[in-house]
Amino acid sequence: SAAIRSLKDIKNINYITLHANAGEETIKAVVKSAKKTNSKLRILLVTILTSISNSSIKKIGHTKSIKELVKKQAFLAKACGCHGIVCAGTDLKSVKKIFKGEIVTPGIRLKGDSAGDQKRVIGPKEAFKNGSTALVMGRSIIKGNIKNNISRLIKELN
């Protein structure tokens, strides 16, 4: 919460992301601090990263599947008063049933683009169809001809 309070004089900060692994107590404190400090500041809870697969989640000690963990994290975001969550497109359908706030989706790839190091990717149109309210795009836009890639994105969305 001290970090949030330190942002009070900085203009044009709309979102702060916080990982769900921070735990309920920390998440609630951050949400409370954001409300006191800046009424426009929106807290987005980050769920399981798109670079993590079910096999790698087990290797780091989790016994539940990614789908189960993300559902728990969506309930946590709701219970703690978060404005939104960040989740992979592959998790959108189950999350949308639980969480009604903003849902930001990373790991977006245009048709034909490599997933690279990302394990759980989805196309932009499918992400919006499945409940995403905003996309995070990097490689599909900046690799190669940016102008051409933006045109590809627009075509995919139409």
Please place each PLM-identified region on the residue numbering.
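Conserved anion-binding
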Residues: 1-84, 88-92, 100, 110-113
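A short pocket-lining beta-strand/turn micro-motif at the edge of beta-sheets
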Residues: 82, 101, 131-135
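Active-site regions of enzymes building and remodeling cell-envelope glycoconjugates
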Residues: 100-103, 118
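Generic beta-sheet signal
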Residues: 46, 105-107, 137-138
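Catalytic-site microenvironment of enzymes
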Residues: 32, 36, 151-158
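Glycine-rich phosphate-binding active-site loops on the catalytic face of alpha/beta enzymes
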Residues: 11-23, 110, 117-149
